[in-house]
């Protein structure tokens, strides 16, 4: 059985992530969506909340061969522990490649038997990032085209509804 790991913070999971999971699920027998407990980024959602959002998203999109698991430590060690043949990474733009390439080389050095495979999302998801989605949500923008419904609802609860014009801006005369 060919099992792969798709790791990330998923704070929150977006339709871009779903797109990559869909591609991986078609190519491999099992996709483990690894939700990182430790991250250098400050997260909006706690690990348990991120896990729930990922699990509900996998169920909503009927990914019968994908599961979500939390993990700590090195991603490549987690992949080895799960007997994964590869780590899946999504590439949105050339700017992603340099960082992902360095990570892939380091992972290869640590565990040469674990490959890193890059998958590109569809054009309509290539610009998506969790950070942008959170910022748009904070500013009261419409995010339904970027995230699953369960995530949109969770963001509204977490961030709260804001006025469309929360700050009056005065212009110099």
From Swiss-Prot:
It comes from the Bacteria. Gene3D superfamilies: HUPs. GO terms for cellular component: cytoplasm. The keyword Magnesium applies. Belongs to the bacterial CoaD family. Homohexamer. This is Phosphopantetheine adenylyltransferase. It comes from Methylacidiphilum infernorum (isolate V4).
């Amino acid at each position: 059985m060919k099992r792969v790991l798709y790791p990330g913070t998923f704070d929150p999971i977006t339709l871009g992530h779903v797109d990559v999971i869909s591609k991986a699920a078609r190519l491999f027998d099992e996709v483990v969506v690894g939700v990182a407990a430790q991250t250098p980024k400050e997260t909006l959602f706690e690990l348990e909340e991120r896990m729930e959002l990922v699990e509900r998203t996998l169920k909503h999109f009927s990914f019968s061969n994908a599961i979500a698991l939390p993990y700590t430590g090195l991603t490549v060690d987690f992949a080895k522990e799960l007997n994964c043949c590869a780590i899946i990474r999504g590439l949105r733009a050339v700017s992603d490649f340099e960082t992902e390439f360095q990570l892939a080389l380091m992972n290869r050095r640590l565990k040469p038997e674990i490959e890193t495979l890059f998958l590109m999302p569809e054009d309509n998801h290539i610009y998506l990032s969790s950070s942008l989605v959170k910022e748009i949500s904070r500013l009261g923008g419409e995010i339904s085209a970027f995230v699953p419904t369960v995530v949109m609802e969770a963001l509204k609860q977490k961030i709260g509804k804001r006025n469309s014009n929360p700050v009056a801006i005065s212009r110099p005369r």
